[in-house]
Amino acid sequence: MSQQSISNFSSKLLILFWFSMVFSVVLNTVFWFSATMFNAEWFNASYPIDVSLPLSNARSLIGYFPSMISTLLTVALLWQLIVLFRLYEKGIIFQLQNAECFKKLSYLLIATPFVEFLMGVLLSFALSYNDGNWNTSFSIDDSDITMMIIGFIVRVIAVVMEKAADLQEESELTV
């Protein structure tokens, strides 16, 4: 693949990543408030604890913030992809900046099950805060574990990219 085609493809992916980043925040917000405040029957929502819908405005707003935690993780992942593909768009392929992007991506992916755990606990607290008793619930599913495993694989790729950047630098110095 030529540098020009890598640059063109990266430009197209950047548009997709930006759209996805904005769209994920907006959709999560709309779905959260639709499901919790209006009890939209067309939307099947699940919560870490049993709740009776619709929620009060305050309870819905308090629950919104922990519900956004996994969306913010997605935004952080998309941001790292944007940074990486901007480098590709500029023709920067085997440089330490790329390896740093891969490293940050790996850390975010490895953090996925822990973030989901935290979100479940905080969301269950937020949704049960006025019942007189505090309920705690969390879940970690196989997709979270899969993301963590992918994170370890991406971390190995980051190390390989660091070595490639070193080789690229040596190659440029010897010419």
Per-region residue spans from a language model:
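Hydrophobic alpha-helical transmembrane segments of integral membrane proteins
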Residues: 94-124
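Alpha-helical transmembrane segments of multi-pass integral membrane proteins
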Residues: 116-175
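Lipid-exposed faces of alpha-helical membrane segments in multi-pass integral membrane proteins
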Residues: 16-30, 65, 69-72, 111-119, ...
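Alpha-helical transmembrane segments and their helix-start/interface "positive-inside/aromatic belt" motifs
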Residues: 5-26, 103-106
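Transmembrane alpha-helical segments in integral membrane proteins
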Residues: 66-87, 152-166
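Membrane-helix interface motif
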Residues: 30-46, 121-127
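Perimembrane loop-to-helix junctions flanking transmembrane segments
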Residues: 40-58
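Cytoplasmic juxtamembrane regions at transmembrane-helix boundaries
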Residues: 2-7, 81-104, 169-175
